[in-house]
Amino acid sequence: MTASAPTTTLGNNHGKEVILVVDDEASIRRILETRLSMIGYQVVTACDGIEALELFKTTQPDLVVLDVMMPKLDGYGVCQELRKESDVPIVMLTALGDVADRITGLELGADDYVVKPFSPKELEARIRCVLRRVEKESIAGSPNSGVITVGDLRIDTNKRQVYQGDERIRLTGMEFSLLELLVSRSGEPFSRGEILKDVWGYTPERHVDTRVVDVHISRLRSKLEDDPANPELILTARGTGYLFQRIVDAVASEGT
């Protein structure tokens, strides 16, 4: 396949959110560029993984739409490379019925997925939902925000950051939103359905693999727990879902 020059509308739409669309199918790139531009986003496109990483460095997009199967470097490889340096939201495009694609992408740090063939409206809805989470970060800092400390774990809901001792633990926007939800009702379980609705904005009408939640819980545990196989913070509620340990010795303080 002959690589096409990257397409960008950056020069004409300053101040708008930038989306990097990565797919080796030219027709999909054209459709998404047109649709996303029409609803107000700046769009940059890449036809393979190598081009995507190069464009990411120069454009610093607000969100990446990333196909799995691509030449040179596949979507998994791109996701891994991006997660080494960035928490940018990533929405994966996966093959119809291929559960392994979805789970692998989430395990590598993707925030969400859309199954091919997909409706552009569905992808637009997923993008809006994920970006709303990011927007929440940018407007954080209200007088009601604060810091919750559990042992040596410090959760700053003002800056949407987590520290273990003096070390900052890097979380994606979705991971922090999931943690924030669990902490908001510590000691009480959330069902997977509740989590999908509150964190990802999924409705019951959309049949989503609940392993989306399981994978993100696993990633959170790997980052926050001393022994992820025997968690003490994020617990499994048998037959229900998950809960954060009851905060009885936590210290809550106002953000500064």
Show where each model-derived region lies.
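DNA-binding patch around the recognition helix
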Residues: 145, 170, 215-217, 221-256
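Acidic catalytic/metal-coordinating carboxylates
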Residues: 48-51, 74-77
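A structural micro-motif at secondary-structure boundaries
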Residues: 148-176, 189, 206, 243-256
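Active-site beta3 strand of CheY-like receiver
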Residues: 59-65
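Basic, amphipathic DNA-recognition helix from helix-turn-helix-like DNA-binding domains
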Residues: 24, 80, 84, 89-149
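Conserved acidic segment of CheY-like receiver
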Residues: 15-27, 32-36, 64
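Short hydrophobic/Thr-rich beta-strand motif most characteristic of the beta2 strand and flanking loop
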Residues: 40-47, 55
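Receiver (REC) domain active-site loop signature in two-component systems and cognate sites
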Residues: 70
